[in-house]
Amino acid sequence: MVYEIIDGFVQAIQLIVSLNPEVVTITVLTIIVSLTSTFLSAIISVPAGAYIYAHDFFGKRLVINIIQTLYALPTVLAGLLLFLFLSHQGPLGFLDFLFTPQGMILAQMILVTPLIIGLTITALSGIDKDMRHSIISLGATKFQAIVTLIQEARFAILAAVILGFGRAISEVGAAMIIGGNIRAFPGDILSGTRVLTTAISLETSQGDFPLAIALGLILLGVAIVVNVGLNMIQSGSLWKNSWNS
């Protein structure tokens, strides 16, 4: 059994090094879907988080609690609910997003958006109160003050976006339900919906361990890159704070 495992890893590395077409297709589609969903989520989430932070309104605490609860939204549940909406009988059936990369992007956005909103609120709340008062006392409008605070908290907000990307790329439940794990046609990456996580699940169940291991190693590599990026951002933030002090 040990020799079979070793042989599986050897074959997996060969698949990666030789740029196996299926491995490349699955990896590229995964990155496209996850980057797109994270980018779109960030465009929505950062302004939304800043708005919630800067305004006092009835039920604000409840809204924040709901957002934080959605951090742990089960991916299978998110996929099921979105499936009902995107099915032909559902209210969003006219979009024809079911079993498409667009549908997977939408599913990942549902999972990532609350995370980035909540962490944006937390990042802005961590700014020194004296700085907030100083910005307002200098005559800045509320919009200008919010923009300045976002710039001040940019390291923490960027870290939130990277964490969102990590959640998106490691998601499997919603991707399986909404995407259907469809293999792409040769030469047309966007014709399929098979991403790293769903492909690993499929290949493992079919006994193709070398391919599953190869995809798993790539997913692990992405996780390492995300972690290194977070550490670099945190180091930059600490250096900035120590320099200012």
Q: How would you describe each model-predicted region?
A:
Residues 18, 176-224:
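Interhelical loop and adjacent transmembrane-helix boundary motif
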Residues 1-38, 55, 202-208:
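Periplasmic/extracellular loop-to-transmembrane helix junction in inner-membrane transport proteins
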Residues 32-44, 48, 74, 154, ...:
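Hydrophobic alpha-helical transmembrane segments of multipass integral membrane proteins
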Residues 122-133, 142, 154, 169, ...:
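Transmembrane helix boundary and interhelical loop/hinge segments in multi-pass membrane proteins
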Residues 2-21, 78-109, 179-190:
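Membrane-interfacial helix termini and adjacent extracytoplasmic/periplasmic loops
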Residues 121-129, 136, 147-148, 209-245:
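C-terminal transmembrane helix and the adjacent membrane-cytosol boundary/short C-terminal tail
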Residues 119-120, 142-177:
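Transmembrane alpha-helices
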Residues 36-67, 142-145, 149-150, 229-232:
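Transmembrane-helix boundary motif in ABC transporter permease subunits
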